[in-house]
Amino acid sequence: MTIIDGKQVSANLKQELKTAVEACRQKTDAVPGLTVIIVGEDPASQVYVRNKSKSCKEIGMNSTVIELPAETTEAELLAGIEALNNDNDVHGILVQQPLPAHIDDYAVTMAILPSKDVDGFHPENVGQMVLGNLDKCFISCTPYGILELFSRYSIETKGKHCVVIGRSNIVGKPMANLMLQKLKESNCTVTICHSATSNMPEITRQADIVIAAIGRPEYVTEDMIKPGAVVIDVGINRVEDPSRKSGYRLVGDVDYENVNKKASAITPVPGGVGPMTIAMLLKNTLQSFMRVHNIESA
């Protein structure tokens, strides 16, 4: 059984990106810039933003964090995004979720220039992805990171049956579409399961690859997996644990302790998919910079 180590793959990728950023600096006397906007004081969001900023600095990218109070109006936020759209030193714009209830998520997504939408959420980027024009878009970071793990671990995917559990716009839908694409990391027969699927264990037991992104702690159990399946756990859930100083522990959407006895390869939580999400955000930001400066990928 192979443990797919996203933490190590992410570290390796960051080193490669650091080299690429330095090569860009030597060619253009400039480096990629990522700006993250956070509205309000959600503690988890602040941790995520700090991690993104730290990762940027580690590879030599410029990182700017704009902190706005929770009472910021939608119009004020959209005006700030427009200013960043027009700033040539900004190559990636990310608005940290969740936003306060009075701000429309869709309006914010639409306001970001598709060429700077390094989260890959703008309909133009989603549409290009669905059409298979992956060189003309940004791919949503978590699904992109999973493809990278398949590539780095030489997971055989062509013609395999892949079951994606979850249909969110951030992971489930783009992941299912990417697994359909004619890529060396995908090219699968794809089934999507979700909260209204009545016979889910029957379906998942047929899968060569299971990607769990349903947001339920340890939902995927050993009896739902066939022997030798590859299991990718996207979930990050807090469960109470009085034995821990924090009072909780992190678990995924998969019952790791039991499923790993049956799987041929599996991602742990933490340390599996999570670290890849930020790494692919950096990769998308670098790609944005390279498109602006007409630099071809190595």
From Swiss-Prot:
* InterPro entries, alphabetized: Aminoacid_DH-like_N_sf, NAD(P)-bd_dom_sf, THF_DH/CycHdrlase, THF_DH/CycHdrlase_cat_dom, THF_DH/CycHdrlase_CS, THF_DH/CycHdrlase_NAD-bd_dom
EC number(s): the record gives: 1.5.1.5, 3.5.4.9
Q: Which GO terms describe its molecular function?
A: methenyltetrahydrofolate cyclohydrolase activity; methylenetetrahydrofolate dehydrogenase (NADP+) activity
Question: What GO terms describe the biological role, i.e. biological process, of this protein?
Answer: L-histidine biosynthetic process; methionine biosynthetic process; purine nucleotide biosynthetic process; tetrahydrofolate interconversion
Reactions this protein catalyses: (6R)-5,10-methylene-5,6,7,8-tetrahydrofolate + NADP(+) = (6R)-5,10-methenyltetrahydrofolate + NADPH; (6R)-5,10-methenyltetrahydrofolate + H2O = (6R)-10-formyltetrahydrofolate + H(+)
Whether NADP counts among this entry's keywords is: yes
This protein's pathway: One-carbon metabolism; tetrahydrofolate interconversion
Q: Which GO terms describe its cellular component?
A: cytosol
Instruction: Specify which residues bind NADP(+) according to the UniProt entry for this protein.
Output: 166-168, 195, 236
> Per its UniProt record, what Pfam families does this chain match?
THF_DHG_CYH (PF00763), THF_DHG_CYH_C (PF02882)
Keywords per UniProt = Amino-acid biosynthesis, Histidine biosynthesis, Hydrolase, Methionine biosynthesis, Multifunctional enzyme, NADP, One-carbon metabolism, Oxidoreductase, Purine biosynthesis
The protein's superkingdom reads Bacteria
**PANTHER family to which the protein is assigned, alphabetical:** C-1-TETRAHYDROFOLATE SYNTHASE, CYTOPLASMIC, C-1-TETRAHYDROFOLATE SYNTHASE, CYTOPLASMIC-RELATED
Homology family: Belongs to the tetrahydrofolate dehydrogenase/cyclohydrolase family.
Question: What function is annotated for this protein?
Answer: Catalyzes the oxidation of 5,10-methylenetetrahydrofolate to 5,10-methenyltetrahydrofolate and then the hydrolysis of 5,10-methenyltetrahydrofolate to 10-formyltetrahydrofolate.
Subunit structure of this chain's protein: Homodimer.
Per its record, how is this protein called by name?
Answer: Bifunctional protein FolD
UniProt organism field: Chlorobium phaeobacteroides (strain BS1)
